[in-house]
Amino acid sequence: ANTYQLQVDVDTAEFFMMALVLVALLLKLDKEKLFKWKGRIIYTLVSCMIFAGFTQVYVYSDYLENIGVDFRVYRPQYKYRYYGTLLTTMRTFGYLHVTQPKDYSVSAVKKITKQYTDSNSTESTETKKPNIIAIMNESFADLKEVGDLQVSQDYMPFFRKLKENTIKGYTYSSVFGGNTANSEFEFMTGNTLAFLPDNSVPYQLFLRSKTAGLTHTLKNQGYSPCYALHPFYKTGYSRYKVYPLMGFDKFYTSDNFSVFTDTVNYHITDSEDYKKLISLYENRTDKDKPFYLFNVTMQNHGSYDGSTLETGDDVQIEGDLQSYSKAEQYLNMIKMSDNALKELVHYFEKVDEPTVIVFFGDHQPDLEEDFYNKLLHTDIQKLEGEELEKLYKVPFLIWANYDIKEENVERTSNNYLSTYLAEVAGIKKTGYLEYLTKLREEIPAINAIGYWDKNGKFYEVDDKKSPYYELIHQYNLLEYNNLFGKDDQQKEFFYIKN
């Protein structure tokens, strides 16, 4: 986003200087014929062979990983610093190709989907379906869950106290400090980043046609209108292209807010965001139909400059980490988010229509690496497996303004949140949602790092010795068919029949 600060280091400056020299040489050479046509052919062939060999070794093989060069990290920008722009960029190309899962075939997929498409999902007995509001809150995280953080007062008191008619707990994201769109992708489609290339963004790389997911599921059951709201530019992560493919009727952006709208850290506040949300709800045209809105907030977006908020800093970091003003600024922004959530819940408490709100953070904040090192008492660049997952843990809740069974969820992941939502709202599930509901009983959480089984044991995604390897492989087959199956996509499994 446009609030990040650009810092040019020595390596970057050298790279641009070399690039300028190279361009100058090419312009010079263009004016002179150095080789005859036979020589040019030879040099072209040799160049192609060198390039092919380079890409085979450095892009598509495991050579770099075998010598200890690891690009699979939570913050890829650090790899550009450590390994250089050329090598990191070239290696990234290898991650953009999605390999067809082993033993993939349409018949193999049908064998899995048959039991779900043959059975009939039960639909709610409610005479009126509830309105559904899904909020993915920018960088909303609980840093106390990462390490021993001492603060002067709680920064999310309302979130913690909200228990009545509430399902809450922690969900695991597949991204850290950025790539927000990947969290919403997992939530809205039920797919996981575990089977997609590292550092890829499906919105920008893979979604080119109608995309199965929560919005189409709700539309096919009478939800209208189905809105998306994001108080920033529409072009971010190609949302203006992707949201129609997902089934949204209209996409509201910062263009739909007044220039006098309150901001913090250059972004529209959650309070103003929710006022727009309420306005869209109150002024919808189809008031006889259930309402659905998906909201991606912006308030807590980085970068953080450590400045004092205009509202005053109420939360102060104490102890060894008190010098980190950026983290302190962030925590005070989270408290603002908590207050805005309280206002939103209090509003819908008074609404007569049944309404469900699902709320979750997209990822943890992009704060100083040294802050996280001290918070965790280790070098976060060396974290692996379950220890690394501490950086992917964010809070979530599902609240209703009517009676539902309260539940505390120790851990889940973004791809499963829609299954909890479907159960609370009483909506009819697709075969895919039924499958995910059953899968979460055995594998309650999965993300790009790995997964936990029902007993709390952690596994890497590609661990072939895991007793759940076959279940994971089946999930991979289904996701591949969903995203890349084209004409072979099992539509009766991924969509509700009209």
Annotated model-derived regions:
Residues 1-77:
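Transmembrane and membrane-interface helices of multi-pass
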Residues 4, 102-105, 198:
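Ubiquitous "structural anchor" signal
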Residues 6-8, 114, 458:
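Hydrophobic transmembrane signal anchors and adjacent membrane-proximal interface regions, especially
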Residues 56-134:
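Membrane-interface segments at or immediately adjacent to transmembrane helices
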Residues 116-130, 134-137, 142-498:
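Solvent-exposed soluble domains appended to multi-pass membrane proteins
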